[in-house]
Amino acid sequence: MDVTSSSGGGGDPRQIEETKPLLGGDVSAPEGTKMGAVPCRRALLLCNGMRYKLLQEGDIQVCVIRHPRTFLSKILTSKFLRRWEPHHLTLADNSLASATPTGYMENSVSYSAIEDVQLLSWENAPKYCLQLTIPGGTVLLQAANSYLRDQWFHSLQWKKKIYKYKKVLSNPSRWEVVLKEIRTLVDMALTSPLQDDSINQAPLEIVSKLLSENTNLTTQEHENIIVAIAPLLENNHPPPDLCEFFCKHCRERPRSMVVIEVFTPVVQRILKHNMDFGKCPRLRLFTQEYILALNELNAGMEVVKKFIQSMHGPTGHCPHPRVLPNLVAVCLAAIYSCYEEFINSRDNSPSLKEIRNGCQQPCDRKPTLPLRLLHPSPDLVSQEATLSEARLKSVVVASSEIHVEVERTSTAKPALTASAGNDSEPNLIDCLMVSPACSTMSIELGPQADRTLGCYVEILKLLSDYDDWRPSLASLLQPIPFPKEALAHEKFTKELKYVIQRFAEDPRQEVHSCLLSVRAGKDGWFQLYSPGGVACDDDGELFASMVHILMGSCYKTKKFLLSLAENKLGPCMLLALRGNQTMVEILCLMLEYNIIDNNDTQLQIISTLESTDVGKRMYEQLCDRQRELKELQRKGGPTRLTLPSKSTDADLARLLSSGSFGNLENLSLAFTNVTSACAEHLIKLPSLKQLNLWSTQFGDAGLRLLSEHLTMLQVLNLCETPVTDAGLLALSSMKSLCSLNMNSTKLSADTYEDLKAKLPNLKEVDVRYTEAW
């Protein structure tokens, strides 16, 4: 039977042969030829007319015509004896098969066996038919209408050619030929009338597999392939293996124009449309490496800043809601990668997940590696898999470089204990409190990690500058989503302080409320950057700003004041003593609302208020409303007094000169910055019986002065002070001493024996961690 073919009517495309390459110039140019500063772009030669969905299966009539070789076979294959069979055909990756393998379709038809696919158009031919030319015959497919016929035609063409390209590109020999085939494959996808996600993804997956199996390509070959597939990436996410290839190129050639011209629209699309980096972590890693590549350019952060501006847009409100969450996710992952090598390499360093799950047990093992990170591991996926394993380790890390311990608060809270099965979470900030002996510890990162950290912290700063992004950014950062190593890193907390300051300056409640903890029992940025917190480096200036904005909002309540009184009364008093108006107002409100029940604490607050002009004025206004407070002050000074941590000699002098302290019997200067110079003020307290100098810089000179004047002192705590035998020997004149703590001092055994002999009332002595122990 004479079977002819035609392009069909209606002007629609009926047959697609190999499309011509769309790159300008000779496609056979050698690989080494440079493409110019700007990668070439292809025009999208989209077919006019109908669009079709790629078929994967469907019902159709099938007829097979065998080529006649004898007179009898010619009679048997004539149109009068021809029969049609209904089949449900599946267009698999390798062949055309029937759901009921009988009759004509007893055996599947491989795409490699199909020589040609054409539309039938001859006189008296069956309507809506396709012709598949195979060795020894022809397969006719009859659809129900012309649209289905064309849909089957284009789908079969696509499946056949994709199968061919998979075969051709699976065994590359000459890379100039491979590059030409890739370009033709891309052009075929761009000009196809089929509309389906796999139309663009299939070529990308073929190229991705090709690159993963050939890792010895030159840089120029890398760039040529990237430029060739660039048109497909404008509307499609790259597959995971292709992301790995892009990451490698960003690391090895950060200054390549391909990074700017090709990767920029790809990353922009990822940030605008990605919904969950957890399902595609390599997209996040590619975005991370792309931004680092931008940072390596001559302009550095200026280029990154312009990129962030382009993502936000020129208006006051970013039109893409997914950009900010995706940028924050990339920043958090990059910052974590800076510390991840240290987290994974130290046996006694738990992951942040373990801390949040309450997996804490004391451990005395010494770390084997210094706190120094070189290059972060590029395989973020494997790192995340490692971190997901539960490792029940300690959160107490002791070494010459870092010492992290659980702080014992002055409110006598129960000890923090948790087991692996406990649902309660430990206080993260308490876990980060650095002991005074190690307060000068600094974490040093390697050069690459340091650049990465600086880049992404700077991005967080840029994000915080946009008013429309700030509420969401504050909400995302409210749970403190950083590893404890980062929070113990002075450089990180110092740089991040700008972001927290922006939150504190924002008048919107939805922003500055995120400074507080995400729920009760958890610490937030408010606690982290308050005096005594691990991130505080400004003596409470940021803390005062946060309190000011919170008090100016709906937090001017008794509950908020009670929280301050229970947790941050010391910092509030210290800042008020230094003239901070916000803190003076806070103390006045505490008195006015009867937040403080203890009379001694009330007297201490009053003395603090009267030590400054602004405090005295506000206190006088308060006294006009509450005369009973003034009456309380007339009864005399407090018997117990505790100075806030980080108080100085000047702070103590100012406080003691502001009122009467003749009845003061118990004074605690623990964890302050006082020195021996304060001794001249202490000796003016004739009734003083108990003095706590734990972890201060009080030395031998001050100790000698005290021993001459405070002969009635009964309890003295010198734990972790720099005193030596020269000063300790002077204590022999304090015959009333009944309790003496010399823990962690330079006490010698001989001096200890001498003091025991000369102090008959001495009953309690602590000489642990000394030579006399």
From Swiss-Prot:
Interacts with FLNA. Residues 1-30 are annotated as: Disordered. It comes from Homo sapiens (Human). It comes from the Eukaryota. Residues 54-163 form the PH domain. Plays a role in T-cell signaling pathway. Isoform 2 may play a role in T-helper 2 (Th2) signaling pathway and seems to represent the first proximal signaling protein that links T-cell receptor-mediated signal to the activation of c-Maf Th2 specific factor. The keyword Cytoplasm applies. Keywords: Cytoplasm, Leucine-rich repeat, Nucleus, Phosphoprotein, Repeat. Pfam families: PH_21 (PF23066). It is found in: Nucleus; Cytoplasm. GO terms for biological process: in utero embryonic development. Isoform 1 is expressed in peripheral blood mononuclear cells and kidney. Lower expression in brain and liver. Expression is down-regulated in activated cells. Isoform 2 is expressed in lymphocyte precursors, however, expression shuts down during maturation and differentiation in thymus and fetal liver. Its main location: nucleus. The modification Phosphoserine is found at S349, S377, S382, S660. GO terms for cellular component: cytosol; nucleoplasm. InterPro entries: CMIP, LRR_dom_sf, PH_CMIP. LRR repeats lie at residues 663-686, 687-707, 712-732, 736-756. This is C-Maf-inducing protein.
